[in-house]
Design a protein with these regions (language model features):
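Catalytic adenosine-cofactor/nucleotide-binding cores of aminoacyl-tRNA synthetases and other
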Residues: 1-43, 143-148
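Conserved phosphate-binding loops in nucleotide/dinucleotide-binding enzymes
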Residues: 1-18, 69-74, 163-175
Length: 178
């Protein structure tokens, strides 16, 4: 009722708000740590890199298949778990050592490249569910040479076949032990 000026709120609304805030803050972290960045390919230079790239490859498979099978609840759950638990809670935390002042410049650059690649791919996978937020953030990311999409909505999808090169069951098992 517009006359009562009540806020729309529910546990799911609060969870969605918290997730969007997490996406925004993680993106701001990555964007705020790109001093000296030059585009380049993602490389599994560390066990954490191998793990997150492998997890991203699996996510792309599950999301692509889930969308094709209209399993939107599973897709949303997979995206949330990857972004919040794996990318934010683990990989960003692992990356901080390489991003510190005084860290090895080559390790810093590769960490930056991997952060940008994973964030870019995650935003592409999240885009069907969160188009406005993901578009605004994606437009701020540095893009690889040859990326000719002017907007995320027309950018290429992170195809499972393309990301399959990152699959690494051993790296996933190693990080699970941490």
């Amino acid at each position: 009722d517009p006359e009562t000026h009540e806020l729309i709120s529910s546990p799911r609304t609060e969870q969605a708000r918290a997730f969007v805030t997490k996406i925004w803050n993680a993106s701001r972290f990555v964007l705020g740590n790109l001093e000296g960045f030059t585009p380049g390919e993602p490389v599994a230079a560390t066990p954490a890199d191998a793990w997150i790239l492998s997890r991203l490859a699996g996510l792309s498979e599950r999301v692509t298949q889930g969308i094709s099978e209209y399993k939107f609840g599973e897709v949303a759950s997979d995206l949330h778990a990857f972004f919040w638990n794996e990318f934010c809670d683990w990989y960003i935390e692992f990356s901080k050592a390489s991003l510190r002042e005084g860290a090895d410049p080559a390790a810093r650059l590769q960490t930056q490249r991997n952060l940008v690649f994973v964030l870019d791919s995650a935003l592409r996978l999240l885009h069907p569910a969160l188009p406005f937020v993901t578009e605004a953030l994606w437009e701020q990311l540095p893009h690889a040479e040859g990326e000719d999409a002017e907007a995320l909505m027309v950018a290429t999808w992170p195809e499972p076949e393309t990301l399959a090169r990152f699959k690494n069951a051993e790296a996933e098992r190693a990080i699970e032990l941490v």
